[in-house]
Swiss-Prot record:
Part of the 30S ribosomal subunit. Contacts proteins S5 and S12. Belongs to the universal ribosomal protein uS8 family. InterPro entries: Ribosomal_uS8, Ribosomal_uS8_CS, Ribosomal_uS8_sf. One of its GO terms (molecular function) is rRNA binding. Keywords: Ribonucleoprotein, Ribosomal protein, RNA-binding, rRNA-binding. GO terms for cellular component: ribonucleoprotein complex; ribosome. NCBIfam families: PRK00136.1 (NF001109). GO terms for biological process: translation. It comes from the Bacteria. The gene is rpsH. It holds the Pfam family Ribosomal_S8. This is Small ribosomal subunit protein uS8. Gene3D superfamilies: 3.30.1370.30, 3.30.1490.10. PANTHER family: 40S RIBOSOMAL PROTEIN S15A (PTHR11758). It comes from Bradyrhizobium sp. (strain BTAi1 / ATCC BAA-1182).
Amino acid sequence: MSTHDPISDLITRIRNAQMRSKSKVTTPGSKMRASVLEVLKSEGYIRGYATLEHPSGRSEIEIELKYFDGEPVIREIERVSKPGRRVYTSVKNLPRVNNGLGISVLSTPKGIMADHSARDANVGGEVLFTVF
């Protein structure tokens, strides 16, 4: 199945799986999705992920979701930049999510990274989504 916005699809799959208290969720594989999941893993929002190769040649990513006291670690996950309205920001104007308790995930010339990493690297970019 082809999706026009793979990041929104990934976010929706994670949100829906956590509402149903699923421990794992699968999504079609891509380098961009893997990069986004690597940021979520390094920030502690998911336990991990694994890429699964099928004999047909396509790949899937299995995401292991994270819970604390039975509640999902991700309270809110919202898409910011959409195909119809791209949102770009400079390093000076990077948004703080819930006063620094959450993160913004950005696509920068140096790769996909969290907002604090972008500040350290002094780069701006496209704000993909926010997590709290």
